[in-house]
Amino acid sequence: VTFSKASSKTDDERANPKRANLRTKPYVLERYLEVKPGEVLEGKNIESTMKEMYRTGIFNRIEPNITGSETDPNARNVEFLIEERPTTTINGSISYGTAVGLVGGLKLSDDNFLGRDQQAAINLEASNKGDKTFSIDWFDPWIKNTERVQAGGSAYWRESRDDDADWDELEKVKTIGTRWTIGKGLNKDIY
């Protein structure tokens, strides 16, 4: 069983060796694999593998290619041709609320961070009334070499104005903190 990047080169584009490799790490692909080397090849295992890989949301197209072996007439080689979708996004926002005023925000996120199927994000928001927020977030939906253990965290800094403060009290409230999460994914047969 092998994984290859589906060709997306157009006729007027030069071949780039960097683009020939999958961004997603091999262990991420292998953990969803239902087709095992040495076992009888069944269509339902190929379909299950494809379904689990599509469920990650980081692939546009997955095509199985089954070929015979040159040395063993009973053996089959399975190659999955994979087209990865762009997973990095930059979002900007502007909003207005009577309590916070005009708020602007910028977010940079990646749903396949470093090819490990992890989500990472940096978020920055500021308002014209003095409120500011900065956060760094990370989540791994399946920690390597575990039985679907999930973990994530967030570190944040927030500064806001206290409108109810008297003239001699502290006007700005600063908050620094973290949030952590750990969980166990259910098996693939539960929807």
Each PLM stretch: what is its role?
Residues 1, 5, 83-86:
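Conserved catalytic cores of ATP-dependent inositol ring kinases
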Residues 2-13, 187-191:
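Short, intrinsically disordered, charge-balanced linker/junction segments flanking boundaries
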Residues 8-35:
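N-terminal periplasmic "start-of-domain" segments of outer-membrane beta-barrel proteins
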Residues 22-23, 39-191:
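Gram-negative/organellar outer-membrane beta-barrel architecture
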